[in-house]
């Protein structure tokens, strides 16, 4: 699917091919490790291999079962990545003998708990863009300023949808009963891709509505949107680009509980201050849906036949520590930034480029 971009600048020309030299990811833990406890915490560097391949190699050499290795999240294959894993400290001596050409243990400490999925604040990224002209470097500088000030949409990246980008279609067929999948792990993966696809469609729709509200008058919108003028006025008065709708579900930022948006004006001020952010639906069971006007939009991107657990996901995020430097001699533009967990650096790159970057 072609997602809708938040910014309206013309496409920026650069070359990006993901590799350990151009793409570095460093995991930021959710909490500091205590230095004491029965769990060995290991900072691991890997390149050109998946997290699963890394875990398999450690399991085989150290003698620990994969299910007994804790990790917070999966990291890119075609990259240089740093992440933390945990295993019982009885494996420490065996781990010290571990050797692999693509994996290196950087540091060791201890903690009382095992690392669990999702136990990370986010990730720091370093990205090198190539074949960047001076005029395009200046454009990138301007885009980074906007993204740091205003944030960006939290789309799922192309990696979520498989090599051919059609995993969501297979997941939809499973939900519809048109396809059987015996492998439970693969079945969940495909349905998750379908949930993510619906989220991306909804987010594009909300960006489209926000663009309309930012660009047209009340008179023009009253003829286009089936909304009372009072609602249009309330929406247009909001400072953020991305408009909150009555009945939206928001969440404290960068983490916290979800809550229903009742005071649209007040909550939009908190959103502008980066204290909260709206959320979108990942359809599934035991998941809260929006109310009112927000639900009128959301329902077109819901599928109540999905039997997997659903969730709410930030629709909008605020990149931090954004830095860019242009190396004219090499025609490189190097940027670094922090994103919260579950957010995609490639989505930020595509927002900068104003085009798809997969396959370059």
From Swiss-Prot:
<dbReference type="InterPro" id="IPR050170">
    <property type="entry name" value="TruD_pseudoU_synthase"/>
</dbReference>
<dbReference type="Pfam" id="PF01142">
    <property type="entry name" value="TruD"/>
</dbReference>
<dbReference type="GO" id="GO:0160150">
    <property type="term" value="F:tRNA pseudouridine(13) synthase activity"/>
</dbReference>
<feature type="active site" description="Nucleophile">
    <location>
        <position position="76"/>
    </location>
</feature>
<feature type="domain" description="TRUD">
    <location>
        <begin position="151"/>
        <end position="332"/>
    </location>
</feature>
<dbReference type="InterPro" id="IPR011760">
    <property type="entry name" value="PsdUridine_synth_TruD_insert"/>
</dbReference>
<dbReference type="InterPro" id="IPR020119">
    <property type="entry name" value="PsdUridine_synth_TruD_CS"/>
</dbReference>
<comment type="similarity">
    <text>Belongs to the pseudouridine synthase TruD family.</text>
</comment>
<comment type="function">
    <text>Responsible for synthesis of pseudouridine from uracil-13 in transfer RNAs.</text>
</comment>
<dbReference type="GO" id="GO:0003723">
    <property type="term" value="F:RNA binding"/>
</dbReference>
<dbReference type="GO" id="GO:0031119">
    <property type="term" value="P:tRNA pseudouridine synthesis"/>
</dbReference>
<dbReference type="GO" id="GO:0005829">
    <property type="term" value="C:cytosol"/>
</dbReference>
<dbReference type="InterPro" id="IPR001656">
    <property type="entry name" value="PsdUridine_synth_TruD"/>
</dbReference>
<protein>
    <recommendedName>
        <fullName>tRNA pseudouridine synthase D</fullName>
        <ecNumber>5.4.99.27</ecNumber>
    </recommendedName>
</protein>
<dbReference type="InterPro" id="IPR042214">
    <property type="entry name" value="TruD_catalytic"/>
</dbReference>
<keyword id="KW-0413">Isomerase</keyword>
<dbReference type="InterPro" id="IPR020103">
    <property type="entry name" value="PsdUridine_synth_cat_dom_sf"/>
</dbReference>
<keyword id="KW-0819">tRNA processing</keyword>
